[in-house]
Amino acid sequence: MIFNEYEEFCKKMDECIEKYKGKFGCIVTFNGFVREYDLKDGEKVPSKGMKIDEDILEKLKLVIEEAKNKFDVIDILFYHNTGFLSIGERIASIAVFARHRKEGFEALEYIINEMKKYH
């Protein structure tokens, strides 16, 4: 499930903890934020922020479905911010509900790598 409002993501996270209680062994999470620099050819370059188009949400829905089909996980929640993001702003939050940490971490790594293709 994908969200463009962080508060909705947090609310759904709490709901899923209750819904899946006893079924999941871990929740593997990731939170990404805008840095004060970018890396260009291995060099740090000052950043003023980043622009994220809203069409990324549709692309990320497909990534979530792919991850659910590829890895043995219970559920995936994904928040992604859009518009111009200033330094320090949250870009994304991901929560993977899994029976075991191995599958949870593998799914999370896959999602992050796919997401980075659109940044």
From Swiss-Prot:
GO terms for biological process: Mo-molybdopterin cofactor biosynthetic process. GO terms for cellular component: cytosol. Pfam families: MoaE. InterPro entries: MoaE_sf (IPR036563), Mopterin_biosynth_MoaE (IPR003448). Signal peptide: none annotated. It comes from Methanocaldococcus jannaschii (strain ATCC 43067 / DSM 2661 / JAL-1 / JCM 10045 / NBRC 100440). This is Uncharacterized protein MJ0717. To Synechocystis PCC 6803 slr0903.
